Amino acid sequence: MGEVQHLFSCLVHRFPMQEQDEIEVIKDKGFKGCIHGRPGSKRQVSLIDRETLDKFGLAPGVVKENITTLGIDFQTLAIGNLLRIGNCVMEITGPCDPCARMDEIRMGLQEQLRGQRGWLCRVMEAGTIRRGDRIEVVAAAFENAETKDMEARVSG
């Protein structure tokens, strides 16, 4: 189990993320007001753990994550896991691959973050998330009946 340490929303493309104490989360869209949230997208909310940020000497929000977590082992998470964050539920849809913009923060950071940039999620249940809220895995990948490609993952 972990906790929400920081919440960020991007209001204008290519501008710094804005930190929030709490944020409304919209089902199948993402954070209210965040330009990166889109209906149907598998990239509605991004998460990174504080431990990774600390390892690379990065401040929360600088790599454009929506949620900075603390105390949850990202290595134990998998595509299809359902996370309860505050009173919302999100499905992990895949790893967040570091883009070339990471090298704008610090040359070589894109390669350094490969495999460690966190997770992408889609919002399954709307609600509100606040700093300090608990994060818990509420369903493993194989238990998540709403995942459309579940059969392919189980059989393949």
PLM segments and residue spans:
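Electropositive, beta-rich accessory/interaction domains or terminal extensions
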Residues: 1-101, 128, 138-156
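A conserved acidic, glycine/proline-rich C-terminal tail/linker
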Residues: 102-123
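Compact mixed alphabeta submodule
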Residues: 117, 124-138
